[in-house]
Amino acid sequence: MQEKHIAEIADYIAKHRQKLRLILIAGPSSSGKTSFAQRLRVQLQVMGLRPFSISLDNYFVNREDTPKTPAGAYDYECLEALDVDLFNKDMFALLKGESVVLPRYNFKTGEREWEGQTPLTLEKSQPIIVEGIHGLNEKLTAAIPREYKFKIYVSALTQLNIDAHNRIPTTDARLIRRLVRDYQFRGASALKTLKQWPDVRQGEEKYIFPYQEEADVMFNSAMIYELSALRRYAVPMLEAVTPDVPEYTKARRLLDFCQYFLDLPDEEDVPNNSILREFIGKSVFFKGEDQV
């Protein structure tokens, strides 16, 4: 079903290629939006288009200009952390067929760099794919007429219920995805991820969910078998959370939740282009540190 839906979205974009030039993809944490963007890119190529992907990370303002949270940490999630004016200027120029040198953000120095970057010129009807948490917010692309934009909201809407009265919370399913991914590719313990989760949720409530209605289409990345594939990683991680920390209660609740599922007999049955591979590894779309 997911493959069919991606093909339908790509087909719509291809049929309206003269107008729909800027493809904006957004969604909450661990919704699978990065893998979705890659799969959409491949499908558009199959249809004869040559999509170009642009990372919003390269439009971060210099670190010294980045807003801070009340706690004093750099707030990379707020819209003000991006140079929105420069992003609009570059996107507008590219869509007009002009040559643009795109910035590259150096995370070590905390500064944008242009030196060594090759000028980019897009062909007529060549779409741009942009994936990021602010993709649905009109303020991000205010200079681009709405008719040139196609906005996609990616979420993981769980399709299973525990029983007739208790559904599986979508937020819990995403949290389990994130627990596994952060451990697999960032070496983060379950405790660390659980501690970060309230801040992640706060960012979603502020920067993502208010703009859902802006989307032209919604893509559901949930899979009926995913919790069976994730639990073999999640259970030992959650069992390591000790009773002396506040996050213990949430860990136990997620553990109880995992007990409703059996392990997937053979993980190799998960296709290497599956969105689930973004979390458990061996995705055809990611190589080593690219998955971090």
Segments (PLM) and residue ranges:
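Extreme N-terminal, non-catalytic leader segments
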Residues: M1-L24, F52
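Conserved NTP phosphate-binding and transfer environment spanning the P-loop NTPase/kinase superfamily
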Residues: E3, R17, E138-V292
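Walker A (P-loop) phosphate-binding loop of P-loop NTPases
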Residues: S30
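Conserved lysine of the Walker
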Residues: K33
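Post-Walker A helix-loop "phosphate-sensing" segment adjacent to the P-loop in P-loop NTPases
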Residues: V42-F52
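Conserved nucleotide-sensing/catalytic segment adjacent to the nucleotide-binding pocket
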Residues: F52-I54, V61-G110, P127
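Glycine-rich phosphate-binding loop used to anchor ATP phosphates in small-molecule kinases
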Residues: N88-E147, L194-Y211
